[in-house]
């Protein structure tokens, strides 16, 4: 795919937003559930904690005790489930509120209308220590979590985190600031140091994580859905399968009749581009028995179904989140 096309896709990803309707937890409100909501259209690549200072100011007059908490004491929930603050809001929405189908019908459009704006609850007390790590007033915890995720992606790509470790202090902090400010040009400048344009630096593996929302465990006391995260080495290319090699040899044998002058057995294994379909078939064969067509489940990224034929490396370069990871949500079909 042309670099201009990849850049265009990345621009669209960074421009993607989700309408949010954030309400104050009734137990913390002077008026219980009658507090006015906070409405905002929020970038998919952003993180919910960045909203906490303005939410604390907005709901301050409605809090039973506004002096009892600070902005960094805030956390979010959806239908009673605490939301992991280190996940981008776009991933959280795809996990918990559904994904946009490849083709819309009147029925799915009506469903979208019910899901948007996405209704979240903000809390400034009763921090769920069992589910979430606490934030700090300086934002250091959030920054460090982001940079650690960037390091992990760098290690997966190159077998070492030397790239992110050798960034200047300004570039390291600038990467996080670019994501916070949704500043794509600044982000691209720094990311091009970590992920040089192909083919200057061949990649070892591709940073992709698969998320499988599952029903609550039978032995669990919670009604919250269980979330399984799958990560496996995904190289940019794969070896030719025996059946594919046989087809190549058969074609070579036919052409040896004089059409091309090739001799029987001349076909050699050639690396093939790793696609979303081949990767999913390899990692989750029961859910993806076909490499070409979603049959049982479908991959969702940034609210849209990902084509099975899409090369994984191109998806990483064009549609990764700010930390360099491609977070694909697996949704059952039917």
UniProtKB/Swiss-Prot annotation:
Gene3D superfamilies: 3.10.20.620, Autophagy protein Apg5, helix rich domain, Phosphatidylinositol 3-kinase Catalytic Subunit, Chain A, domain 1. InterPro entries: Atg5 (IPR007239), ATG5_HBR (IPR048940), Atg5_HR (IPR042526), ATG5_UblA (IPR048939), Atg5_UblA_dom_sf (IPR042527), ATG5_UblB (IPR048318). Keywords: Autophagy, Isopeptide bond, Membrane, Protein transport, Transport, Ubl conjugation. It is found in: Preautophagosomal structure membrane. There is a cross-link at residue 151 (Glycyl lysine isopeptide (Lys-Gly) (interchain with G-Cter in ATG12)). Conjugated to atg12; which is essential for autophagy. It is a peripheral membrane protein. Residues 252-272 have a biased composition (Low complexity). Residues 237-272 are annotated as: Disordered. One of its GO terms (biological process) is aggrephagy. The keyword Membrane applies. It comes from the Eukaryota. Signal peptide: none annotated. One of its GO terms (cellular component) is Atg12-Atg5-Atg16 complex. Pfam families: ATG5_HBR (PF20637), ATG5_UblA (PF20638), ATG5_UblB (PF04106). Involved in cytoplasm to vacuole transport (Cvt) and autophagic vesicle formation. Autophagy is essential for maintenance of amino acid levels and protein synthesis under nitrogen starvation. Required for selective autophagic degradation of the nucleus (nucleophagy). Also required for mitophagy, which eliminates defective or superfluous mitochondria in order to fulfill cellular energy requirements and prevent excess ROS production. Belongs to the ATG5 family. Conjugated with atg12. This is Autophagy protein 5. It comes from Emericella nidulans (strain FGSC A4 / ATCC 38163 / CBS 112.46 / NRRL 194 / M139).
